Regions:
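Beta-strand-rich interaction surfaces with strong enrichment in secreted/lumenal proteins
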Residues: 86-88, 159-163, 196-197
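Localized edge beta-strand/strand-to-loop motifs within extracellular or lumenal beta-rich domains
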Residues: 168-182
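Glycan-recognition/cleft segments
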Residues: 115-147
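Extracellular, beta-strand-rich glycan-interacting domains
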Residues: 31-39, 97-106, 215, 223-246
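Extracytoplasmic low-complexity segments
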Residues: 5, 18-78, 87, 93, ...
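Short, aromatic/His-centered strand-loop micro-motif at the edge of beta-sheets
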Residues: 146-171
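Sec-dependent N-terminal signal peptides
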Residues: 4-13
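Flexible glycan-contacting loops in extracellular carbohydrate-active proteins
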Residues: 193-232
Length: 246
């Protein structure tokens, strides 16, 4: 399988306080998007949409030498960015990784019972494909990765060894290699589990950043599900290296 990378960046990764090894887009990068090109959309009257950014495919897309000093800033009230690309994300099977560099803006965000979403392209009710990646303090602080394995819904929880801090950059990485699914924070392993079968991250729904990706859905109390992120996202990359590593 051809190696495919989707890279989104807003600051030069060499300045990150988190370990940056392996984060630079390389010669296999086929799509690149700069967070700074978008301002934040916001849900209004519980029905609005955020801004849309189209990923432009290109051969050997380079990381720009001069980048803005800030990433995409989210207010936690419904602002988000939507990624439009054919089939949402072309990561269908084999080994993969998802990397996110972020920092939280408030203590209230980290204590919020519902947690927050970083990126995803499926709703809670979709079972056979797509993914969600976020944070939850419910029954212990953890990162949550919801996905589909052989057409069945699965959830991978990675408990935090210590609380997140506001104003600090973190590198979060979800990775599958062979039969191991792992979660790392600043290159430190948080959790690992064995998986056998095909994980399908692709979904026809566009991936949304900084919010629950199906903003029309409501909870049992008929409240709109938002769980918006409050903070800054600086870098996101998807890598599909396939079973043969090519």
């Amino acid at each position: 399988m051809k190696k495919i990378l989707f890279a989104l960046a807003a600051l030069t990764v060499s300045t990150l306080s988190a370990a940056s090894a392996g984060m630079e887009p390389d010669d296999n990068t086929v799509a690149f998007w700069d967070f700074s090109m978008q301002k934040q959309g916001q849900i209004e009257d519980q029905s609005g949409f955020g801004n849309t950014a189209a990923l432009q495919s290109m051969e050997n897309a380079p990381l720009p030498k001069i980048l803005p000093e800030e990433g995409a800033v989210f207010d936690g009230k419904g602002g988000y960015v939507q990624i439009q690309v054919k089939d949402s994300l072309k990561i269908r099977k084999g080994d993969f990784s998802i990397e996110v560099v972020f920092k939280c803006a408030s203590e209230e965000l980290l204590k919020r019972p519902s947690g927050f979403f970083l990126i995803g392209n499926k709703s809670h009710t979709e079972k056979i494909s797509g993914f969600l990646l976020g944070y939850s303090p419910w029954q212990g602080r953890k990162f949550c990765f919801q996905y589909a394995l052989d057409g069945k819904a699965r959830s991978f929880n990675a408990p935090l060894k210590k609380p997140l801090e506001t104003g600090k950059w973190y590198l979060l990485r979800i990775s599958r290699k062979g039969d191991k699914l792992s979660c790392l924070l600043d290159n430190q392993l948080l959790a690992e589990e064995k998986v056998q079968g095909e994980i399908s991250l692709v979904n026809m729904r566009a991936a949304r950043i900084g919010i629950y990706p199906a903003p029309w859905q409501r909870d049992k109390q008929n409240r709109l599900i938002v769980n918006g992120f409050e903070g800054t996202l600086r870098f996101i990359r998807f890598s599909d290296i396939g079973r043969d590593g090519k």
